[in-house]
């Protein structure tokens, strides 16, 4: 397994989570004092039974939820509860776990979905207007690079297969300027061909020295992509394993809140 990962020199610390606590809207603690680091060129996998706090952690790191206590530092800058955290400005790429709710508009066409969330800088042409020619030409480029079928950028997003929809979201997030990539359930509900392709594109970003967090309920996905694996249980990290020592059995024990004997 480890031979499949590209050999990448792990660089400086990019992401620092320090004792982060997040409550849900009812005041119930969902993330309970979590700490981890992610370095350049490193993939940290986050495993756990769904509902262990992964969703709330991601929402806190992307500015969608409030960090109750603790700190989130990205590239030396403290982003904890930054008012109006702009993911593009802070160079955070976010592949959300629910593409229909958080990542795309089904009634928009492919090119319009490529431009979502990027209107503030990349596609402006003065007077606050969008450069639709640029949006269309970039959409064509990414459709080819990410092997999206059919190849027409004016097709309605909602009419595409799940795999092609997900490739568009992955393309949009990976192609924008970023230093930290959060990939949440990146291959949920897609076919095997799309799974392999999306994994390949995530590992290409690792080669470029990006700090990457992959959150998945699929253990094979976590094992195939990660350098280290943080296992969550009931809002806490129950253990962090290096990929060389990680097995499905060990991860399963930690997911249930157990301890691994040395």
Name the predicted role of every residue range.
Residues 1-262:
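Glycine-rich phosphate-binding loops of nucleotide-dependent enzymes
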């Amino acid at each position: 397994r480890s031979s499949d990962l590209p050999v990448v020199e792990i660089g400086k610390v990019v992401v620092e989570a320090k004792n982060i606590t997040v409550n849900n809207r009812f005041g119930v603690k969902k993330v309970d004092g979590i700490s981890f680091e992610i370095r350049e060129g490193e993939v940290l996998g986050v495993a756990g039974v769904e509902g262990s706090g992964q969703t709330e952690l991601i929402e806190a790191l992307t500015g969608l939820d409030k960090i109750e206590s603790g700190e989130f530092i990205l590239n030396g800058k403290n982003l904890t509860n930054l008012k109006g955290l702009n993911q593009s400005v802070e160079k955070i790429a976010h592949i959300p776990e629910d593409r229909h709710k958080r990542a795309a508009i089904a009634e928009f066409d492919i090119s319009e979905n490529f431009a979502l969330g990027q209107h503030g800088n990349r596609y402006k042409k003065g007077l606050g207007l969008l450069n639709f020619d640029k949006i269309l030409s970039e959409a064509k480029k990414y459709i080819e690079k990410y092997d999206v079928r059919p190849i027409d950028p004016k097709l309605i997003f909602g009419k595409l297969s799940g795999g092609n929809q997900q490739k568009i979201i992955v393309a949009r997030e990976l192609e924008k300027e970023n230093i930290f990539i959060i990939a949440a359930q990146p291959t949920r509900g897609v076919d095997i061909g799309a799974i392999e392709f999306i994994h390949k594109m995530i590992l290409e970003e690792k080669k470029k020295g990006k700090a990457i967090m992959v959150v998945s309920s699929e253990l094979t996905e976590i094992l195939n992509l990660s350098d280290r694996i943080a296992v969550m249980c009931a809002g806490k990290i129950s253990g962090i394993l290096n990929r060389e020592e990680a097995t499905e059995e060990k991860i399963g024990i930690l997911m249930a809140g157990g301890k691994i004997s040395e």
